[in-house]
């Protein structure tokens, strides 16, 4: 196998791992006692409702293996909503929430099981005890190979 084939194989593996990680999301989290609050303003909520007004919004961080781990989730019903994003509990050895400066990865799963990646404006990083207001969002469906 030559270098180009090896690089193509490695690239394909990482792309497929990223896509499968986005499709295998678990929207459950533990309350760690410390958080950041994020409010989705009505303008952002309207964009989500244009896709589906029933589902779950989740905030995820990536672990060292590149897996997405939920640190907050909320049932969404088509209106303005806010979520507390859990911080890492420094009294435990495992990473169980966001650390300062972590990029926030947003996903939305509608009631039919379709998964969407959410790009927020402004784009945020985690900052303990802060409040962020998301003014607008763009959703792009993640191809999970699910047919409805």
Please identify what each model-predicted range represents:
Residues 1-7:
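Bacterial N-terminal signal peptides that target proteins for export
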Residues 7-10, 16-148:
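Primarily marks secretory-pathway-exposed extracellular/lumenal segments that are disulfide-
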């Amino acid at each position: 196998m030559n270098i180009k084939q090896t690089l193509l194989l490695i690239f394909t593996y990482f792309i497929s791992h990223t896509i499968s990680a986005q499709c295998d999301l678990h929207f459950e989290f533990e309350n760690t006692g410390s958080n950041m609050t994020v409010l989705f303003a009505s303008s952002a909520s309207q964009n989500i409702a244009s896709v589906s007004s029933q589902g779950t919004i989740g905030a995820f961080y990536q672990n060292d293996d590149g897996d997405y781990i939920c640190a907050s989730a909320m049932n969404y019903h088509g209106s303005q909503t806010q979520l507390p994003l859990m911080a890492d509990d420094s009294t435990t050895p495992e990473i169980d929430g966001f650390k300062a400066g972590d990029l926030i990865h947003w996903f939305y799963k509608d009631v039919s099981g379709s998964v969407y990646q959410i790009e927020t404006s402004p784009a945020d990083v985690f900052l303990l005890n802060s409040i962020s207001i998301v003014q607008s969002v763009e959703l792009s469906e993640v191809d999970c190979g699910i047919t409805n």
